[in-house]
A protein has these predicted regions:
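Polybasic, lysine-rich low-complexity intrinsically disordered segments
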Residues: 3, 11-20
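Alpha/beta catalytic barrel-like cores
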Residues: 29-141, 148-164, 168-179, 209, ...
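Short, catalytically relevant binding-site loops at active-site mouths
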Residues: 192-194, 225-227, 249-252, 258-259
């Protein structure tokens, strides 16, 4: 007898086999986006959506001359377009298996610029709530990475005050979206100002001066030139701030500072995970690879995921998110899904399926 088993993506139906009069059942396959133990995150821009006509992207900009010519109303219109496109991107991410997304700091352009008329979030509150509602519905994590001009450890009070204003803006956006504590804001340690030990001490002192809404979301990332992973862990233990481990910055720092001794990357994982556990926040890592140009430049794609990151859920019993910092954005993530299918959040089944994550993501 012939093997008459058949699977199709079409809707369920009955098909008659003309020769032997056997009945087939055509099975409908469901695709569901579920949270995974290791999730890959998209940074700010989507190449696929940016190529649409009209383009979909949440980081429109506006130069000062245009603001002066057209006024604050035009600025708000472009911000509204940013937010409308952000809503579309959250839905797109869910359909394409992406559960973590870094928001662009350009979402509200010139929000902290003292040279233009100040404006409130009132005109955008409904859209902010819509973004947050969609992210919470899908159990997606939204984060920020404020620019490197945010310098908590600066010895200059005026620059520190500007940093406060900038970080408050990012915190306010996440708060208006209704996002929980896993929606963090990542900053680097900043410059060393000629004395690393004095700067680390000042960083801790200034951190305690930050508004509570900023401290609730701020996390510290190692960089390739100033703050090593050891420095970040030291600061973390003093002020109880979570540490984001950037794998590429770790390797670059070792190249640029051959006089310093480091253990293998996996050695630091327990301290890093503990920094998040103390605050009850899901751990977050950054992965990138060297591209063309100076040390630290990002490549188009990621060829290899570090083994010590992939084994965290099984070894430590903790689920983690990993931002993919590659120039090809979502295309780099899809390439990794092909190489590491266990990372793909899209699950195909003949039954509707929903997995409950082990930890709360918001």
């Amino acid at each position: 007898m012939r093997n008459l088993f058949s699977i199709s993506l079409q809707k369920k139906k009955i098909k008659l086999k003309s020769e032997n009069y056997f009945l087939f059942r055509i099975i409908k396959m469901y695709t569901t986006c579920v949270n995974q133990p290791v999730q890959l995150g998209l940074c700010c821009l989507n190449i696929t959506l940016k190529a649409e006509k009209p383009p979909i992207y949440p980081s429109r900009k506006m130069i000062m001359r245009i603001i002066r010519e057209r006024g604050i109303g035009e600025l708000k219109r472009r911000i509204t377009d940013n937010l409308k496109d952000l809503v579309k991107m959250v839905h797109w991410n869910e359909k394409n298996g992406i559960k973590v997304f870094r928001l662009s700091s350009e979402l509200f352009m010139h929000k902290t610029n003292p040279e233009i008329e100040d404006y409130t979030f009132d005109f955008a509150l409904d859209l902010l709530k819509e973004v947050g509602a969609a992210a919470r519905k899908y159990n997606q994590r939204l984060t920020f990475h404020p620019g490197q001009y945010n310098v908590v450890g600066t010895p200059h009070e005026d620059k520190f005050q500007k940093t406060i204003v900038e970080l408050e803006y990012h915190a306010d956006v996440l708060n208006h979206m209704g996002m929980g504590k896993n929606s963090v804001m990542v900053v680097h340690g900043g410059g060393l100002y000629g004395d690393k030990e004095a700067t680390k001490k000042r960083w801790c002192e200034n951190y305690k001066r930050l508004p509570q809404k900023v401290r609730d979301r701020l996390v510290l990332e190692n960089c390739e030139r100033a703050f090593s992973i050891k420095d970040c862990i030291e600061v973390s233990k003093q002020v109880n701030i979570p540490v984001v481990f950037d794998t590429h910055h770790f390797e670059c720092y070792k190249l640029l500072h051959p006089e310093e001794h480091f253990e293998e990357a996996g050695y630091y994982i327990p301290d890093i995970l503990d920094s998040w556990k103390r605050r009850g926040i899901k751990p977050k890592f950054h992965v990138s690879e060297q591209g063309s140009g100076r040390t630290g430049h990002h490549s188009d794609y990621i060829e290899v995921m570090p083994k010590y990151l992939l084994e965290i859920p099984e070894k430590y019993g903790v689920w983690v998110d990993v931002m993919i910092e590659a120039k090809k954005k979502e295309l780099a993530i899809f390439k990794l899904y092909e190489k590491y299918p266990e990372l793909n959040c899209l699950i195909k089944s003949d039954k509707k399926f929903k997995r409950k994550p082990k930890i709360h993501l918001h």
